[in-house]
Amino acid sequence: MVRPLSLGELPPSYTPPARSSAPHILAGSLQAPLWLRAYFQGLLFSLGCRIQKHCGKVLFLGLVAFGALALGLRVAVIETDLEQLWVEVGSRVSQELHYTKEKLGEEAAYTSQMLIQTAHQEGGNVLTPEALDLHLQAALTASKVQVSLYGKSWDLNKICYKSGVPLIENGMIERMIEKLFPCVILTPLDCFWEGAKLQGGSAYLPGRPDIQWTNLDPQQLLEELGPFASLEGFRELLDKAQVGQAYVGRPCLDPDDPHCPPSAPNRHSRQAPNVAQELSGGCHGFSHKFMHWQEELLLGGTARDLQGQLLRAEALQSTFLLMSPRQLYEHFRGDYQTHDIGWSEEQASMVLQAWQRRFVQLAQEALPANASQQIHAFSSTTLDDILRAFSEVSTTRVVGGYLLMLAYACVTMLRWDCAQSQGAVGLAGVLLVALAVASGLGLCALLGITFNAATTQVLPFLALGIGVDDIFLLAHAFTKAPPDTPLPERMGECLRSTGTSVALTSVNNMVAFFMAALVPIPALRAFSLQAAIVVGCNFAAVMLVFPAILSLDLRRRHRQRLDVLCCFSSPCSAQVIQMLPQELGDRAVPVGIAHLTATVQAFTHCEASSQHVVTILPPQAHLLSPASDPLGSELYSPGGSTRDLLSQEEGTGPQAACRPLLCAHWTLAHFARYQFAPLLLQTRAKALVLLFFGALLGLSLYGATLVQDGLALTDVVPRGTKEHAFLSAQLRYFSLYEVALVTQGGFDYAHSQRALFDLHQRFSSLKAVLPPPATQAPRTWLHYYRSWLQGIQAAFDQDWASGRITCHSYRNGSEDGALAYKLLIQTGNAQEPLDFSQLTTRKLVDKEGLIPPELFYMGLTVWVSSDPLGLAASQANFYPPPPEWLHDKYDTTGENLRIPAAQPLEFAQFPFLLHGLQKTADFVEAIEGARAACTEAGQAGVHAYPSGSPFLFWEQYLGLRRCFLLAVCILLVCTFLVCALLLLSPWTAGLIVLVLAMMTVELFGIMGFLGIKLSAIPVVILVASIGIGVEFTVHVALGFLTSHGSRNLRAASALEQTFAPVTDGAVSTLLGLLMLAGSNFDFIIRYFFVVLTVLTLLGLLHGLLLLPVLLSILGPPPQVVQVYKESPQTLNSAAPQRGGLRWDRPPTLPQSFARVTTSMTVALHPPPLPGAYVHPASEEPT
């Protein structure tokens, strides 16, 4: 056994290095980058020293500033309007939407409430009288809903949408029609008499029972009222609408119902109807001509035989249409029912919302639990409620997440030595990050950036995880500062060593989120901007306020106070003799591979007069062979970490009696230095790492081909809820969307009729457009208008031929003949407006099916005023609206003959139904076809665009991938520039960007394997992943650049320095994300928790496995090298007086160094801080 050497036996020519020895630039290195680095680090050093000097003031002012910004949350606005959240900013869709609102206003024509009925058993048939009876029960319960608001009772008949209520000159008949006119309800029950039960209107006539649709025969009623009133015009209106006997002429589902009318086809036979046969082809409302509900709107999951006959269906759907808030407000404005409540549009909206919520509730409870069928109810208010609940801040999850992070930070930073522990720093750091997040969001509110679901559900946790990373980094670096650093410079030294890393990560994160704002979806643009601002506030808090907290904690540690409970002194504070390097004298240690360990044997005893433990450090030392060094002497260069106090435990027997416990020095840094780095940097391990990541990249490239576009509404709604069940059933059975083809102004409609017909034909031929029945004309205003003109032309021709209409009189003709007479004599010339010679020389519609241009706008005025049902069915929504014009056949004055022309149209629309849209590819195909049709029409001079929810929410997918690639490329370039500027090494910046690009590709591929579809939300996360990935890579890269020696040595040193803070940062991010897993929304779990968790794990693997291996193989040369001042004797060979260790300098390692390590066992504690009390050594024997 080799006898330990005394200090006097050290090699004679060793000169200890000065602490402030300046770094020397390597040969061939650029001096400008190093000067810039030195200048930047000098600024950080100065900042840290100033903050430490005025830590109390900085902390107070910082908390006040951040607290003031956090008050901005009081003015935060949460946006839940889908159009405001998802329509692309500045896109053609937003411009088209603006044009529509400019012409028609904010509100749609009506709102929809839907009931879907399916069998409990999968695939069960609903085309049975029993199933229809259950549907009637649910629909009837829903239609009888009443709510009381503002002292009034509101039922369906008051708030429902009524299509084309005609104006009748007879006051009594007009009031009766107003009360009786049916609501628009699209239901399969309209094929039967029971559909009348859903209509709640009633009227009273003397001598008759209450008139309701269940007992109303319009033909019989007109015959009874004929002798008492002139109803010829009203009769013609009903005949044109093909009302017939209305509901009383339809079969009864239950022919045994005592109220089933005698006119029902199966009333006398008492036979149940053939439900499949009756529903085949759809149903009609009270008007057979204008109210045809196509089969696809009523039945889902249908099956047919070989002849095309309907056999069965799996779902039924009924749709109740309500007025919009504006329509309801206008309808009751000035009415006697609302004159005393200050009627407003907001009140109208509240009435509709209350009725819709009650509608959904009662409909879902209508059927008994043991029924064979189930009802799914939904309304537009339900969707708003979902979005509102989706956007609410979950206080429980926020508080739980932050408490979990507080606990983790406190436990992670606790140490055995109370004076060295940093639990309070961890608590204060997390609370500071929470305040920074609140202040960032408050600043966003003050800047007018609206909040949305992503802001409230995701950002608090994501920002917490990212912000705490830098807290761990600074705290870790602060405890590992060189022990001989003067006390006033501790904070400056900490910022000088870690400020660059913090700046790099924060700037890259901000740039990443700002680049993510390139995605033109308002909700995600707001989220990206808010995230960037929050990261900026975190950066300011970490760089300015947190150093003040560390400085205060330094004072506590210097005074040997307890952690957390800083008012109490530490019971385990030690008094230690501080052994300075100068005590070694001017002796020099030759440079070689040998590991020089100066082991100071420490003995402790407790003084009788004090409770303090006194440590005596006798001057002894010995040399040991470094057999336990995993990487050889190369790992322990002066450029490496100086955190190996307590790492040497030489000696046996009584000298080892005070050896510390293993758990006292086993840390992540210890693991990285002694286990992880030696294993990772072996040649075979490097090959395995490169092979693994190459295979992962290859699999990810394949997975990227599996990623589909899309985001279904079912992904947003919580699973297991009734709303999710409805949306799933609707997507499966009734994937129908109402759209419109809008024609704008800027062209002459009268001379472009052929182009309009061609446009309609091209649009109708699209695969996704549901064609009308073969027996029904297209449902557009231009077709209805032309058909109406042809009808009155035929009536005129008949009256002219019979002599009831002559050149000078039309009083004996029919109502339609008289209208045609007035139109035919119009010239359109203001000087000579009438020309009676045209009665026989012109037609209202020519042989080509076109309306004469000079008659077009005057005929439009007459049609709008005379055919309200046709106008309502066409959904034309003319702007400017044609003027009102009343026709009186018996008024033959010249003024009555003149017809005012409508103003040139600036807005009109053709309605269509799209069906079969299940996947995003189906939507994209339909959108592209519609856009192509509009482009072709534009070449013919017709300005048109498609409108509807598919174009609002799915058109983003046309350019989403291009936008994604553009944002990623721009961000990678920006990341390269930022890293190259702050690291002053384009070589290193290139390696970082390579790793980040690999992470993005791999995350995209893993999304494909997980079945996560690509929408604007994953695009934001993918773009932001580049910035977040910098957290895991730049620390290792910076540690590699600032280390000395070979690539392996510098990679090991970088891992030792950064393994702990990077791991702590990843764990803190995962803890922040963990609270997202408790969300009620699968959307949050799948698209945020899963994706961000995968991103964090990928970042950890790439930062601690791939990047060190790449740096050890392809890393840039060191920028600086620390050179010790040595005497010439150091370079000569020498041998110790005792023992077999050689001090030869190996020729292959010209820059090898000896390392002097102070190891001592002081009640499990490292040496004290600079300036600690030093007790004089006693003469206690060894």
UniProtKB/Swiss-Prot annotation:
* A GO CC term assigned to this protein in UniProt: membrane
Q: Name one GO molecular function term.
A: hedgehog receptor activity
InterPro entries for this protein = HMGCR/SNAP/NPC1-like_SSD, SSD, TM_rcpt_patched
Q: Which GO terms describe its biological process?
A: cell fate determination; epidermal cell fate specification; epidermis development; hair cycle; positive regulation of epidermal cell differentiation; regulation of cell growth; skin development
Q: Which residues cross the membrane?
A: 58-78, 395-414, 429-449, 458-478, 502-522, 532-552, 687-707, 964-984, 992-1012, 1014-1034, 1065-1085, 1087-1107
Query: Which intervals lie on the Cytoplasmic side per UniProt?
Result: 1-57, 415-428, 479-501, 553-686, 985-991, 1035-1064, 1108-1182
Query: What is the protein's membrane topology class?
Result: Multi-pass membrane protein
* Localization: Membrane
Tissue specificity here reads:
Expressed in epithelial cells of the developing hair, tooth and whisker.
Residue ranges, Extracellular compartment? 79-394, 450-457, 523-531, 708-963, 1013, 1086
| Predominant location category | membrane
Q: What Pfam families does the entry give?
A: Sterol-sensing
- Give the record's keywords alphabetically: Glycoprotein, Membrane, Receptor, Transmembrane, Transmembrane helix
Q: Which residue intervals define the domain SSD in the entry?
A: 394-552
Name the domain of life.
Answer: Eukaryota
PANTHER family per UniProt: PROTEIN PATCHED, PROTEIN PATCHED HOMOLOG 2
Family in the record: Belongs to the patched family.
Name the UniProt record assigns to this protein: Protein patched homolog 2
State the organism named in the record. Answer: Mus musculus
